[in-house]
Amino acid sequence: KEKFLKNTPAIARLRKDVLNAVEVKGFLRGIDGRVLSIRSPHSALNTLIQSAGALIVKQATIFLHEKIKQENLDCNMVAHIHDEMQLQVKEDIAEYVGQKAVQSIQATQSFFNFRCELDGEYKVGNNWADTH
């Protein structure tokens, strides 16, 4: 672990800053401003990262849902698993909806004023195995 942190000084600094924040405040703030309770200092950075990932995907899902409704697209969300959306879509609009899904993920970057570029990908197939 020490070798990894030595070779990635930005992560080491982030880890130190997160631990200091937990020590001073007793909690962290998520990218949406909510309080993140920290059960143990060693899990603080993971809590921050997992919270951000969950919020990004949920907001992207909202953006995509709004676009689907706005354009009256014939498709249904059939599963939402961690960082993955599964949609049942007519074949003739599958590529278009996939592009809209990626754009929805990208749009969350400015929504949360996120400094890291956000992107996604989509796959078209007949079942979950084809698209996972």
Residue ranges and their predicted role:
Residues 1-132:
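Conserved catalytic core of nucleotide polymerization and phosphodiester-bond processing enzymes
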